[in-house]
Amino acid sequence: MSGRKKSLLKVIILGDSSVGKTSLMNQYVNKRFSNQYKATIGADFCTKEVVVNDRVVTMQIWDTAGQERFQSLGVAFYRGADCCVLVYDVTAPNSFKNLDSWRDEFLIQASPRDPDHFPFVVLGNKVDLDNRQVSTRRAQQWCQSKNDIPYYETSAKEGINVEMAFQVIAKNALELEAEAEVINDFPDQITLGSQNNRPGNPDNCQC
């Protein structure tokens, strides 16, 4: 594995308080779930090393507080994100309605190079519970209306689709990073047609 190229990918998880953001991160990184709810204060992160397309990737996964007083964490927190995960609780309709606000908040704060094609992933969490309020179809329609955002229904408690979802998150984040590397490899743009740069102009002689 030492010959593989390594990458650090910054992934931000957003969503209302108590939708299961911390539990999803802990299930993915530590294979652990706790029934004791503890609100995240500000932001925290975990890292996990995975292999995507024969490339070693260190995912830096940022878990954020969902309370309103923490909603504006500042430009520095969002800057440099390679993927944004939007999480809602399938038993809490308001958490689904607020996905628009969280998506807008991210785009405003992060100011990605190409906002229309920035990689988001939506997770409908707590599918292990019986009192579901948001249908799969409704969630899929919302994702389709936002440029076909990938959508997964998960259970942090049971580990349902958590590994699969984060594999897609890593893959999409890596693709964004690769595109950014290609753009940065291009030299500065040269403007042609300037009168002073035309051949034969005596004032532009390089002799």
Curated annotation (Swiss-Prot):
Phenotype seen when the gene is deleted: Pupal lethal with no gross morphological abnormalities. No effect on overall brain structure or photoreceptor differentiation and axon pathfinding. Accumulation of autophagosomes and reduced number of autolysosomes in fat cells. Impaired lysosomal degradation of endocytosed Notch and Boss receptors in the developing eye. Accumulation of endosomal marker Hrs and photoreceptor membrane protein chp/Chaoptin in the brain. Targeted knockout in photoreceptor cells results in progressive, stimulation-dependent loss of synaptic function and ultimately the degeneration of the entire neuron.
Binding-site residues, GTP: 15-22, 34-40, 63-67, 125-128, 156-157
GO molecular function, a single term: GTPase activity
CDD domains, sorted: Rab7 (cd01862)
Protein name: Ras-related protein Rab7
Organism in which the protein naturally occurs: Drosophila melanogaster
Biological role: Small GTPase which cycles between active GTP-bound and inactive GDP-bound states. In its active state, binds to a variety of effector proteins playing a key role in the regulation of endo-lysosomal trafficking. Involved in microtubule minus and plus end-directed endosomal migration and positioning, and endosome-lysosome transport through different protein-protein interaction cascades. Governs early-to-late endosomal to lysosomal maturation. Controls endocytic cargo sorting towards the late endosome facilitating its eventual endolysosomal-mediated degradation.
Gene3D superfamilies cross-referenced by the UniProt entry: P-loop containing nucleotide triphosphate hydrolases (3.40.50.300)
Keyword hit for Membrane: yes
Effect in UniProt of substituting residue 157 to N: Mutation with reduced function that causes Charcot-Marie-Tooth 2B in humans. No detectable effect on viability, lifespan or behavior in heterozygous individuals
Keyword vocabulary terms for this entry: Autophagy, Cell projection, Cytoplasmic vesicle, Endosome, GTP-binding, Hydrolase, Lipoprotein, Lysosome, Membrane, Nucleotide-binding, Phosphoprotein, Prenylation, Protein transport, Synapse, Transport
Family: Belongs to the small GTPase superfamily. Rab family.
Reaction catalysis annotation: GTP + H2O = GDP + phosphate + H(+)
GO CC, one annotated term: perikaryon
Location of the motif Effector region: 37-45
EC class (word): hydrolase
Lineage top rank: taxon: Eukaryota
GO terms of biological process kind: autophagosome-lysosome fusion; border follicle cell migration; clathrin-dependent endocytosis involved in vitellogenesis; endocytic recycling; endocytosis; endosomal transport; endosomal vesicle fusion; endosome to lysosome transport
Subcellular location: Early endosome membrane; Late endosome membrane; Lysosome membrane; Cytoplasmic vesicle, Autophagosome membrane
Membrane topology (UniProt): Lipid-anchor
